A protein has these predicted regions:
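Short, Lys/Arg-enriched C-terminal cap helix and immediately downstream tail that follows
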Residues: 180-193
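Short amphipathic alpha helix immediately N-terminal
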Residues: 136-158
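Amphipathic alpha-helical segment used for protein-protein interaction
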Residues: 33, 115-144
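N-terminal module of bacterial RNA polymerase sigma factors
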Residues: 1-31, 35, 64
């Protein structure tokens, strides 16, 4: 527990203006973030040029702009970093698709089994991002759960920990129900396209 308390303390120090706190935090979460980035990149095409280390570093460049964010704990930070990495990959995919201009892209539907803890092969990240944007308008809490679980790789208990700091505290049972609902909704949306 000391490690988690240290991470939470460093996040609070950083949000209060201590830029060196982020530097001290980095080695404590870097391996976890790198593993997460590597799992994302396993789903990318063979000629993908972005490496896991570069993806983590790009996300760190973005998170530096969020210093005054109300950081809650390690799970919250990892979830935000996962979201940043997702956005980087979506932007990368959009640029790649724009460069192709060949129109021969094959859409591969997302099966319900594929919507699990981490990004799976054959998921069209641009399409998934668009569907998640629509979902978040109608179901913001459930969309946050999807981001934390699907992209952040957090467990139900870790997601509850993130929400425990919010005004919108929810139980693990509610998170599980919301996760089942979100999976079904996203599956329906992505297979109907």
């Amino acid at each position: 527990m000391i490690l988690r308390e240290n991470i939470t303390g460093l996040l609070h120090e950083w949000s209060e203006g201590d830029d060196a706190a982020l530097e001290r935090l980095t080695p404590l979460v870097y391996d976890e973030l790198r593993r997460l980035a590597a799992s994302y990149l396993k789903t990318e095409r063979a000629d993908h040029t972005l490496q896991a280390t570069a993806l983590v570093h790009e996300a760190y460049l973005d998170v530096r702009e969020m210093r005054q964010y109300s950081w809650q704990n390690r799970a919250h930070f990892v979830g935000v970093m996962a979201n940043l990495m997702r956005r980087i990959l979506v932007d990368y995919a959009r640029r790649h698709n724009a460069e192709k201009r060949s129109g021969d892209n094959v859409k591969v539907p997302l099966s319900q089994a594929e919507l699990s803890v981490s990004v799976k092969p054959n998921v069209d990240l641009v399409e998934l991002d668009q569907v998640l944007e629509r979902f978040s308008v109608e179901h913001p809490r459930r969309a946050k759960i999807v981001e934390l679980k699907f992209f952040g790789g957090l467990t139900i208990d870790e997601i509850a920990e993130v929400f425990s700091q919010d005004t919108d505290k929810i139980t693990t049972a509610t998170i599980e129900r919301d996760w089942r609902f979100a999976r079904a909704w996203l599956h329906s949306e992505m297979t109907s396209v």
